[in-house]
Design a protein with these regions (language model features):
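N-terminal leader/linker segments that initiate helical-solenoid repeat arrays
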Residues: 2-101
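Canonical tetratricopeptide repeat
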Residues: 89, 122, 126, 167-168, ...
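Structural signature of tandem alpha-helical TPR/SEL1-like repeats
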Residues: 64, 68, 98-105, 134, ...
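Residue at a conserved register position within TPR or TPR-like alpha-solenoid repeats
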Residues: 94, 107, 126-127, 172, ...
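Short coil turns that delineate tetratricopeptide repeat
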Residues: 81, 114-115, 159, 194, ...
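TPR alpha-solenoid repeat register
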Residues: 86, 119-120, 164, 199, ...
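Canonical positions in the second alpha-helix
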Residues: 110, 153-154, 188-189, 222-223, ...
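Terminal, low-structured helical/coil segments at or just beyond the last alpha-helical repeat
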Residues: 2-13, 214, 218, 227-230, ...
Length: 278
């Protein structure tokens, strides 16, 4: 299952970069059009666990769908700690097939039963994973607002959490009319913890999106120093490519290919290297 999830993540990297470069963050590139008011974080009532679960089950193996449905039936009759245990089983089932959207609603439900910081944080992280690179813009916006709500609840439970602040900052950049407020939160995290992996990675992605490639390169160098994975090398290579540093781009793309061991990504990288080597 872990290998399957890795391929799904790596396979989405190319598409994400294309989206990032095609849709600059409002307020970062076109600052004159930025509005100062941020959207309120209101969870959507129209998007819920029941319809997300039903939608996500489509295309899954019939036996797995039955397992999930059976647990859902038990959850409906349970309460307290018994309900928490069943919800965790349900979250694990969705995690096995890399489906963060239903996971997010499940963790939020766990937080409502037992309002713990860890449940709100997991809900926020899963919502964020679910809306990232999602083609359905209406659903993505709803999940984004849910992420903001979950991270805000997590921060209320633990005001010093850099993980919650990082998640909230990232969600605010992509889900409100005041992206600079989200960037400010991320910078607060980096000021407190200069090597913070997730904050640097998130700022690096937003630097790519706002076409600040020099800044993106520095962010991903910091990330790679701690966690040299295929995804980060791919983003680093993209930064180098866009400022004309072809040799460095080729080297980074090659490292991404080696670490990913994913045929579809390897083919794409081979084409990129051929173009850059001309």
């Amino acid at each position: 299952m872990a290998k399957t999830k890795q391929i799904i993540v790596i396979g989405s990297v190319v598409a994400l970069v294309a989206v990032l470069l095609a849709q600059p963050i409002k307020g970062l590139v076109n600052k004159e059009k930025q509005t100062a008011a941020a959207s309120e974080s209101k969870p959507s009532n129209e998007v819920n666990l029941e319809n997300i679960s039903s939608m996500t089950k489509q295309g899954l193996d019939a036996s797995l769908v039955k397992e999930i449905s059976d647990i859902e039936g038990q959850v409906a009759k349970a309460s307290g700690e018994d309900k928490i245990k069943l919800l965790q089983q349900l979250a694990n089932k969705w995690d096995d097939v890399a489906k963060p959207a239903p996971q997010a609603f499940i963790y939020e439900e766990m937080a409502k039963v037992s309002p713990k910081f860890e449940y709100w944080l997991k809900a926020g992280n899963a919502y964020r994973a679910a809306y990232t690179n999602l083609q359905d813009s209406t659903l993505a916006q709803a999940l984004n607002q849910n992420a903001i709500h979950a991270y805000e609840a997590a921060l209320k439970a633990n005001t010093s959490s850099l993980d919650a602040k990082t998640g909230l900052g990232a969600a605010m950049v992509s889900g409100t009319n005041n992206p600079m407020a989200g960037i400010a939160l991320l910078r607060e995290v980096v000021a407190a913890d200069p090597k913070n992996l997730e904050a640097n990675k998130t700022l690096g992605l937003f630097s790519l999106q706002s076409r600040q490639f020099d800044k993106a390169i520095e962010r991903f160098k910091t990330v790679i120093d701690q966690k040299p994975d295929a995804e980060s090398y791919f983003y680093l290579a993209t930064g180098y490519e866009n400022i004309g540093m072809k040799k460095e781009a080729v080297t980074a793309f090659q490292k991404s290919k080696e670490l990913a061991a994913d045929p579809s990504l390897s083919q794409f990288i081979d084409r990129k290297i051929a173009e850059l080597s001309k």
